[in-house]
Structure formats: structure tokens, C-alpha cells
Amino acid sequence: MKKLLMALMLGMTPLLAICAEPAASADKPLLMAGKHELYQRVLSVPGARMVKEAGGKGSTEVTPFTAFYVYARFTLDGKQWLEVGTDRHGSRAGWLPIASTIEWNHGLTAAFRDPVSHDRVLLFKDKESVRELARQKDLTVYDKLYQEAAQGKSSADSPVIAIQPPGYIDIREDFYLVPIRQHEDIYLGSERARLLQISSVPLEREQAAPDVKPVAAKDYSAGLVFVIDSTLSMEPYIERTREAVEKIYDTLGDAKLLGNVNFGLVAFRDNLASAPQLDYLARTYVNLEQGSNGADFLSRVKSLKAATTSSRDFNEDAYAGVKQAIESMNWTGHEARYVVLVTDAGARGADDPLSSTGLGTASLRQLAQDKGVAIFVLHLLTPATMADHARDAEQYRELADFPDIGSLYYGVPTGDVNKFGKALDAVAGQITEQVRVAANDGELAMPVPTSDDVQLANLQSRVAKLGHALRMRYLQKAEGGQVPSVFDAWMLDRDFRGPERPTLDVRVLLTRDQLSELHDILKQVLDKAEEGLLSPQNFLNELKSLAATVSRSPEQLGTTTATTAGKGNSLADLGFMREYIEDLPYTGEVMGLSLDDWQSWSTLRQVAFLNRMEEKVSYYRALHDHIDLWVSLDGGPVSGDSVYPIPLEMLP
């Protein structure tokens, strides 16, 4: 990192050409309005069929959500048609009815957040209705519209045409797209919001069963994996964890619910390169299948002992243990998924040369959320690490933050074993009770915690809220909740009742091959900068070119940066940067970064920025390898064409 920063400060000569961009065909698609380089694109909707000529017969089925360039528009007998191609170099594929497509002039799509802490999103027929409602900020009018939509009783003249489904929709299981077509900045009170024109399209598989059977309450299960620091001095906490798990198995046995809560255990130490005497970096002692039985779990963890020698410093590779728990466990069948990290040391982040994962806090948390895993942290605030308490606590609070719930962090004062045990019993017991109540088809109450430990009471409140949300997700599977199929609607990206709360996550749809290419290009840009082949200005231009391409037209990756297309061929060099960025509704962190900004930053801030870029490279590699997250739109096995909507904040 120091070498990379020094190279950027020196500002040496730009990178030489590596390869030339292929010559474009004279047969080009239609340009977007007001653009000179960006072409019109569309996505095929599920059920679309292509013909060789407009109005012709002998159609062929098109894979849902395939991106096409638009080469011609034609109206025949009142029906509008598009001639489309697979690239922008003249490869025309055929004709599609315009009704079988949606605009796709950039790759940004919205994903509905779980409405656990905000109202469901209302979809309006026109933007004037939303504008007027936002201007008046009249909760009485809003409540009437909301209740009518929620009850399915909106009148024919209501401005509301649809509402977000009541429960969380897991995009991995029920894939959908909400492409953002236009946007407008408005205010809800004093909060800035965006008014979005969208299309909402679920992926409706033909092979999906027509009848959805009600889920069985007794089948609701939780997977809870302990990730325990097993370095020197951790023996009392390891023993207390065994004790807590043994109690829970007894409780589950009494309730005849063994198998409804499965436990796993991963132990971690530190990088063996710096401390080979530690024996291992991370080791799985019990997986979730083995942890369905108490006797099996306890026998397998008998051999877990704390190390007898210390690691190199007060930081340890906790993220290696968490990542192993996320990746090595079979979470299938567990509706509630938890990792409980127990440690007295700070974690080695992406900027630490001894980090084995290359992941920082944000990217590891995102990887967990991609897999539907909530991370708890029981942070032992021992006297030995007092100097690092504040820094480490900030790191772990961020790691344990769960969307719309809050941070699942608990700092154990002085590392007291009894207080640790009390917190562990409370959290694990609460999760077990949630499963017991669900199995008996009871109402999951949201009790006010009675602990006189304010920090623990706050954590228990969040555990209750999280458990309720996860159970609601499970029960609402029976409702077959899909996003509404709406070709043209307007919505707000903020909660009308509480405008400080976002209701959407912004994502970019990429194929697995495109993510791999993004990984390689970003790594090359960072490597070339470290070698001194990019000036600060050229470095920023490369990052901006890459970010703009990913958001606007990811199939062009490899042709819009000097690193891959040769000197003078980046978007910035060609003068196309503004065209790519100017009307995007959302942008990543590099888009608005200027050379003046960079040069005004402190060295620490520059280093933090570079660390984030390197961390994203590691995240792309990890995400690419998680086969279960990728969606094959044609229903086939996972391939390079499989897709996943990447969170915008994880892109450059």
C-alpha cells in the first residue's frame, strides 16, 4: 500500500498501450437521445419471443432479461417492434415486440428492502401524483392510499397502481428486476429523496409449481455458528461456550426440537507466516450437520484448546474465521442464519499485510448479507488490549450491523467471564426460544428486555426484532410473494413516514464473467499504479472509466480503460466521461472524485481509499466463487452468463 501511494504521489508517466479496441462496424445501433457514444439498449422480459422480421412467424424463445442493442424501431399494424442485436458492432439478432422489452440504458436496478422497519413502497401511475404528495407531506392522504393498497382495495381512480409485497423477497430465490428508467431529485420535508420511474419485472419460471404449499411452522430452523478466538488466554471463554451450548441442547431435547437449531464451531488463530507455532489459521471443529446432535457437538469440540503461545501482536485474523464460517457451512434449510464471533483482539483488515482474506469490514459484512447471515460480535474488552478497545469496537460494530435492525455487537466489560456467559446465554437462549415458539405456531412476542445491563437489553431488543423479521420471511413464503409486474410506475426511494430511512438498495446487474473481468481490470489498474505507471490524474481517470462502464454498459468492460484498451482509449481520454455519468440516478464513490479532491486529502484518507479499492478486488473474487448466489436466467447450471445484482457501494 505504501508503495502504491508513493507511486501516485510521484505521478510518473501513463501506462503504455496493451491492446487496441476492435474496429467498430459502420452498422451501429440507435443512439440514446442527446448522446454521441451511448446506444439504446433493452432487456427482454420473461416470455419474450423473437422473430426474423417484424410481424413474422416462427418465433424463438429468448432467455429472460437478455440485454440487446436497439438497431431499428418499426410500427406494423399499430404494433411497435424493435430490431435488436447482441452487440454494438452490427450483430443483428431479430425483432422483438416493444411490449416484450424494457428500457435498459444503464445497468442500475433497485431491490426492495425488507419492510421490517418502514412502510412498503407504493408504486404510482404518474410522477405528478408523487410530487404533489411529497409537496403536501400530508400523512392523512398518504395513510388512506397506503391502507387501500395494502388491503388490495385501491379504487380505479387511485394514483397508486401497486404496492411492494408484505414480506422480504430473497432475490436469490425469487429473482426480479426493477430497472430505473428516469429519476428526479425532490425533498420529503428536509430530507433529500429521489423520485424514480421504474419497471418491475419478476422472473416467472415455467417450471415453478403452480400451487405453493403452506410452510410448516415446525420446520422453521436456525443455524448458529460460533467463531471463537482460540489464541492464548481464551480457554475460559471456550469452556463457557461449551457450557452454554450444552444447556441449549438440553432445552431443545425437552421441547423435542433437536434438529431445529443446529450449532457449528470454527476456531481461528492468526497468520502462520508470522507465528507458525499457532498450528492453524482457521479450523472447522463442527459443521451444522454434525451440530444437530448435542453429544456429537460436544465430543467434537473436546479437542479445542487455546494456544499455548501468543500471536505476533494484539490483532488476529478473525475475518479468516468468519469467512470460513460463512463459506464452509451448508446453510441450506436454515431460515435463520447466525455467526457469533467471540474474540478479545482486533481483526486484521484488508490493509493488513498479514490478512489472509484481503477483506475489510464492509466487504465481509456484505458477503455475509449476500448469504443471508447475521453476524453477532461478543467483544472481550480485556485489560491487555485496552489501548485498542475504541478502534476495535468501532470495527466490530460495523461488522455486526444488520440492515434495518442495527448492530448486533456486545462489548464484554473487562472481559469478565461471568458477564460473557450471561450475554451468550441471553442471545443463544433468545434465538432458541424464537425457534420453539415458531415450532409451536405461537405468536412471536416482541418483549421489552428486563436486563439491568443497558447494553445487553439493547442487544436483546435487536435480536427480538431480527428474529421476528426472519420468521415473517419464512411464513410469507407460503404467500408466493412476488414483486408486482408493472411496466411503468413511479416511486420514492425513501420512506414517506420516515424519510431518513431508505426503502431500496441500488444494485448493478452483472454476469459472472463480467464480475471476473471487473476483478481483473481493477487489480491491473491498482498494480500499474503501484508500479508507478499511472499519474494521479490517470489513476483517477482509469477508476472513473471503469466505474462508469460498469454502471452504464458492463459488456464494454475491457474497452474503456487505457489499462486494457491502450493509451488514449479510456472514457476520460476520449471525452466521453460526462456523457456516461451525467444522468445516472446513483453513482459510486469515485465518480465525483477530482484531482483537486485527491490532492487535498491527507495521506491517511488516501490510504483508506486505496484500501477500499483493494478490498473490493477481494470481495469480487469471493463473490465469484459463491456458486449458490448466482442466478441462471435460462434455468440451466451456473455459468459465465449467470447473473447477480451487485450492491452499488461494492463497485468502484
Question: Where are the model-predicted features located?
Answer:
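P/S/T/G-enriched low-complexity
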Residues: 366, 380-652
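Extracytoplasmic, non-cytosolic globular domains
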Residues: 242-249, 253, 326, 340-349, ...
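Loop/turn elements at helix/coil->beta-strand transitions in domains of secreted/extracellular proteins
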Residues: 222, 258-264, 295, 306, ...
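SH3/SH3-like beta-barrel superfamily modules
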Residues: 22-27, 58-99, 144, 148-189, ...
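Acidic, polar low-complexity linker/tail segments
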Residues: 171-225, 231-239, 251-254
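Solvent-exposed loop/turn segments at secondary-structure junctions
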Residues: 89-91, 102-103, 230-234, 269-275, ...
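Von Willebrand factor
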Residues: 218-337, 339-340, 347, 378, 381, 386
